[in-house]
From Swiss-Prot:
Pfam short name (any one): Enolase_N
GO terms for MF: magnesium ion binding; phosphopyruvate hydratase activity
Active site: E206 (proton donor), K341 (proton acceptor)
Source species of the chain: Oenococcus oeni (strain ATCC BAA-331 / PSU-1)
Protein name in UniProt: Enolase
Length: 448
């Protein structure tokens, strides 16, 4: 057991070249941990506050020197010499109390989270354990099924695509290493197909391709072709997933969803639900994220009734990793999965609480990156620590995304001690804890 001896934060850059907070924590026995906080582009309005300076003369107003000062000042004073590095809950609750606001608006969730992660890493080092094992204990052995965002749209790119993400999920793989290989092969075949058709193969924020398409269906067609070109079967081996990010398309005044980057079509909520249902019926889609605006709770209940038995309905902007919103969703029957983003809520403790609440309700928890990422690989350890079963961490390019995949392969090797088969489990299609056997069978039999 070792008390916190020092805390130091600095301003560093994320994958978009914007400032973010990095914190370092040392224990009195010399153990060390570092945490770097990611940042989102498509953010839910109820997320914890990402404290920015607002000084337009510096980093276009996106500096984080105020958050850094809060770590080096108030947070350091409250924690140094008072908490053992292993007291994760005590440390997180102390920072929450010090902030004193419901959304961490005083100190900044970016300030608080950097210390929360750094503390956990220092404690893991002190315990002589890898982070996933320190956080989750000896029963942490489920490797996640990846959601690989290989085509980017919406606010994640500059193209004429409305849906924010088009993803592939290697549901038929036997190991995470095989899943990553399948994803990589499909990604490279997708690039060849796009190039052959004269489409741009530059990549977006999350490493996926971001060419223009005629509509939101064409990317799905390309994904099916890419899966087949890689030698796999759509649905059986690799399923599809999409993040609609519908709040970006919704006009609260007209109560309509507009495909503003592509065709310009407008839909009422029931019409938009039917539009999405049509895509699910036509393609081997296993997961749909944020299909409706984050504030339209009754509409979420309806789409869950209609589609929730067939596919995973994920709340991201809808739940913002917040147990208050998740509890309401569970009670109403809205969504059947939650996207877990550390910086949406701001501490590891609250993140674990959200994952546990989801599991108890039969909701799947999907641990996720943000569009503005860093070299920090905490989410790879977190998803294994919690046996969550699914991870969303970008495409098969950009080091900020690949770092997480590499860490997952290291963890799998470590669990199996280099043997082809060991204690690790990759569940593939069975990582959809919220879907019954018939739904899974239907998805894997769907050829697109």
């Amino acid at each position: 057991m070792s008390l916190i001896a020092s805390i130091y934060a600095r301003e560093v850059l994320d994958s978009r070249g914007n400032p973010t907070v990095e914190a370092e924590v040392y224990s009195e026995d010399g153990f060390f941990g570092r945490g770097i906080v990611p940042s989102g582009a498509s953010t839910g309005e109820h997320e914890a506050v990402e404290l920015r300076d607002g000084d337009k003369s510096r980093y276009l107003g996106k500096g984080v020197t105020k958050a850094v000062a809060n770590v080096n000042g108030a947070i350091a004073e409250a924690l140094i010499g008072k908490f053992d590095v292993a007291d994760q809950r005590g440390i997180d609750l102390a920072m929450i109390a010090l902030d004193g606001t419901p959304n961490k608006g005083k100190l900044g969730a970016n300030a608080i989270l950097s210390v929360s992660i750094a503390t956990a890493r220092a404690a893991a080092e002190e315990a002589g354990l890898p982070l996933y094992q320190y956080l989750g204990g000896p029963n942490s052995y489920v490797l996640p099924t990846p959601m690989m965002n290989v085509i980017n749209g919406g606010v994640h790119s500059d193209n004429k695509v409305d849906f924010q993400e088009f993803m592939i999920m290697p549901v038929g793989a036997k190991t995470v290493k095989e899943a990553i290989r399948m994803g990589s092969e499909t990604f490279h075949n997708l690039k060849k197909l796009l190039e052959a058709d004269g489409k741009n193969t530059s990549v977006g924020d999350e490493g996926g391709f971001a060419p223009d398409f005629a509509n939101n269906e064409e990317p799905l067609q390309y994904l099916v072709k890419a899966i087949q070109a890689a030698g796999y079967k759509p649905g059986k081996d690799i399923a599809l997933a999409t993040d609609v990010a519908a709040s970006e398309l919704y006009d609260a005044d007209t109560k309509k969803y507009k495909l503003k980057w592509s065709t310009g079509e407008e839909f009422t909520a029931p019409e938009f639900e039917k539009y999405i249902e049509g895509l699910v019926a036509k393609y081997p889609i296993v997961s749909v994220e944020d299909p409706l605006d984050e504030n339209e709770w009754d509409d979420w209940v309806e789409v869950t009734k209609e589609l929730g038995k067939k596919v995973q309905i994920v709340g991201d902007d809808f739940f913002v990793t917040n147990t208050d919103y998740l509890k309401r969703g569970i009670e109403m029957g809205a969504a059947n999965a939650i996207l877990i983003k550390l910086n949406q809520i701001g501490t590891l403790t609250e993140t674990f609480e959200a994952i546990e609440m989801a599991k108890e309700a039969g909701y799947t928890a999907i641990v996720s990156h943000r569009s503005g990422e860093t070299e920090d690989t905490t989410i790879a350890d977190l998803v294994v620590a919690t046996n969550a079963g699914q991870i969303k961490t970008g495409s098969m390019s950009r080091t900020d995304r690949i770092a997480k995949y590499n860490q997952l392969m290291r963890i799998e090797d470590e669990l199996n001690q280099g043997e082809p088969e060991g204690v690790s489990i990759y569940k593939g299609i069975n990582s959809f804890y919220n879907l019954n056997a018939d739904a899974k069978k239907e998805i894997q039999s769907h050829q697109g």
